[in-house]
Amino acid sequence: MKILTINTHSLQEENYEQKLCWLVESILKERPDIIAMQEVNQTADAPLMAPELLAGQYPVPGALPVRQDNHAANVAIRLWQAGVACYWAWVPIKLGYGKYDEGVAILSLGRPIRSTDVFPISKVHDYQNWRTRAVLGVQVEGH
Protein backbone atom coordinates (compact mmCIF):
# COMPACT_ATOMS: atom_id res chain seq x y z
CA MET A 1 0.00 0.00 0.00
CA LYS A 2 1.30 3.43 -0.96
CA ILE A 3 0.53 6.24 1.53
CA LEU A 4 1.08 9.98 1.11
CA THR A 5 1.01 12.27 4.14
CA ILE A 6 1.00 16.01 3.65
CA ASN A 7 0.62 19.17 5.68
CA THR A 8 -1.31 21.25 3.18
CA HIS A 9 -1.63 24.69 4.81
CA SER A 10 -4.45 24.86 2.25
CA LEU A 11 -6.05 28.27 1.86
CA GLN A 12 -3.28 30.01 3.78
CA GLU A 13 -0.84 29.34 0.94
CA GLU A 14 0.13 32.02 -1.54
CA ASN A 15 -0.84 31.01 -5.09
CA TYR A 16 -3.29 28.48 -3.67
CA GLU A 17 -4.90 27.52 -6.99
CA GLN A 18 -1.53 26.81 -8.61
CA LYS A 19 -0.40 24.71 -5.64
CA LEU A 20 -3.71 22.83 -5.67
CA CYS A 21 -3.10 21.95 -9.34
CA TRP A 22 0.46 20.81 -8.55
CA LEU A 23 -0.78 18.63 -5.70
CA VAL A 24 -3.40 16.96 -7.89
CA GLU A 25 -0.84 16.45 -10.68
CA SER A 26 1.53 14.80 -8.18
CA ILE A 27 -1.23 12.54 -6.88
CA LEU A 28 -2.13 11.53 -10.44
CA LYS A 29 1.51 10.74 -11.16
CA GLU A 30 2.30 8.85 -7.94
CA ARG A 31 -1.13 7.20 -7.41
CA PRO A 32 -0.96 6.64 -3.64
CA ASP A 33 -3.65 4.38 -2.21
CA ILE A 34 -4.25 6.64 0.79
CA ILE A 35 -3.60 10.35 1.27
CA ALA A 36 -3.58 11.71 4.83
CA MET A 37 -3.75 15.50 5.05
CA GLN A 38 -3.46 17.90 7.94
CA GLU A 39 -4.23 21.62 8.09
CA VAL A 40 -7.06 21.03 5.63
CA ASN A 41 -9.30 24.05 5.82
CA GLN A 42 -12.26 25.92 4.48
CA THR A 43 -13.37 29.48 5.12
CA ALA A 44 -15.88 29.27 7.98
CA ASP A 45 -18.36 31.62 6.32
CA ALA A 46 -17.94 30.49 2.69
CA PRO A 47 -21.06 29.29 0.83
CA LEU A 48 -21.92 25.60 1.19
CA MET A 49 -20.63 23.17 -1.42
CA ALA A 50 -23.31 21.95 -3.82
CA PRO A 51 -24.25 18.36 -2.85
CA GLU A 52 -23.67 17.07 -6.38
CA LEU A 53 -19.99 18.05 -6.04
CA LEU A 54 -19.48 15.88 -2.97
CA ALA A 55 -18.94 12.62 -4.87
CA GLY A 56 -17.08 10.07 -2.79
CA GLN A 57 -17.50 11.92 0.49
CA TYR A 58 -18.00 9.85 3.63
CA PRO A 59 -19.62 12.37 5.98
CA VAL A 60 -18.12 12.20 9.47
CA PRO A 61 -20.90 12.25 12.08
CA GLY A 62 -21.10 15.63 13.78
CA ALA A 63 -18.76 17.37 11.33
CA LEU A 64 -19.54 20.81 9.96
CA PRO A 65 -20.98 21.14 6.45
CA VAL A 66 -18.49 21.22 3.59
CA ARG A 67 -18.03 24.66 2.05
CA GLN A 68 -17.11 25.66 -1.50
CA ASP A 69 -13.45 26.29 -0.74
CA ASN A 70 -12.88 23.09 1.29
CA HIS A 71 -9.43 21.89 0.30
CA ALA A 72 -10.12 18.14 0.58
CA ALA A 73 -13.30 18.48 -1.47
CA ASN A 74 -11.49 20.45 -4.16
CA VAL A 75 -8.72 17.85 -4.41
CA ALA A 76 -11.34 15.09 -4.65
CA ILE A 77 -13.33 16.97 -7.31
CA ARG A 78 -10.25 17.40 -9.48
CA LEU A 79 -9.33 13.72 -9.11
CA TRP A 80 -12.85 12.64 -10.12
CA GLN A 81 -12.61 15.02 -13.10
CA ALA A 82 -9.36 13.27 -14.07
CA GLY A 83 -11.14 9.90 -13.98
CA VAL A 84 -9.81 8.73 -10.60
CA ALA A 85 -12.35 7.50 -8.05
CA CYS A 86 -11.57 9.42 -4.87
CA TYR A 87 -13.35 8.62 -1.61
CA TRP A 88 -12.73 11.01 1.23
CA ALA A 89 -13.56 12.10 4.75
CA TRP A 90 -12.82 15.44 6.41
CA VAL A 91 -13.30 16.54 9.98
CA PRO A 92 -12.78 20.06 11.31
CA ILE A 93 -10.81 20.19 14.54
CA LYS A 94 -10.49 23.88 15.37
CA LEU A 95 -11.03 27.41 14.14
CA GLY A 96 -7.73 28.54 12.63
CA TYR A 97 -6.68 32.18 12.36
CA GLY A 98 -10.18 33.16 13.46
CA LYS A 99 -11.63 32.37 10.03
CA TYR A 100 -10.86 28.82 8.88
CA ASP A 101 -12.54 25.55 9.84
CA GLU A 102 -9.29 23.62 10.01
CA GLY A 103 -8.94 19.89 10.31
CA VAL A 104 -7.70 16.65 8.85
CA ALA A 105 -8.77 14.59 5.85
CA ILE A 106 -8.14 11.16 4.43
CA LEU A 107 -8.56 10.39 0.75
CA SER A 108 -8.71 6.86 -0.61
CA LEU A 109 -8.10 6.31 -4.30
CA GLY A 110 -10.26 3.52 -5.66
CA ARG A 111 -11.50 2.06 -2.37
CA PRO A 112 -14.66 3.45 -0.76
CA ILE A 113 -14.50 4.46 2.89
CA ARG A 114 -16.69 2.22 5.05
CA SER A 115 -16.30 3.85 8.47
CA THR A 116 -14.50 6.64 10.31
CA ASP A 117 -13.32 7.27 13.83
CA VAL A 118 -12.29 10.59 15.35
CA PHE A 119 -10.56 10.93 18.68
CA PRO A 120 -8.86 13.82 20.49
CA ILE A 121 -5.13 13.76 21.13
CA SER A 122 -4.82 17.02 23.07
CA LYS A 123 -5.91 18.02 26.54
CA VAL A 124 -7.74 20.95 24.96
CA HIS A 125 -11.09 20.16 23.28
CA ASP A 126 -12.26 23.69 22.47
CA TYR A 127 -13.02 24.39 18.79
CA GLN A 128 -12.03 28.03 19.32
CA ASN A 129 -8.59 27.08 20.72
CA TRP A 130 -5.78 26.62 18.20
CA ARG A 131 -4.16 24.00 20.46
CA THR A 132 -7.01 21.52 19.93
CA ARG A 133 -5.85 18.38 18.12
CA ALA A 134 -7.58 15.20 16.96
CA VAL A 135 -6.99 12.22 14.71
CA LEU A 136 -9.19 10.89 11.92
CA GLY A 137 -9.10 7.20 11.09
CA VAL A 138 -10.88 5.41 8.27
CA GLN A 139 -11.62 1.86 7.26
CA VAL A 140 -11.66 1.32 3.51
CA GLU A 141 -13.35 -1.41 1.53
CA GLY A 142 -11.30 -4.58 1.44
CA HIS A 143 -9.31 -3.83 4.63
Task: State what each model feature region is.
Residues 110-142:
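Active-site catalytic loop in hydrolytic enzyme cores
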Residues 74-82, 98-116, 140-141:
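Conserved beta strand-loop-helix elements of the APE1-like EEP
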Residues 2, 101-105, 134-136:
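Short beta-strand micro-motifs in enzyme catalytic cores
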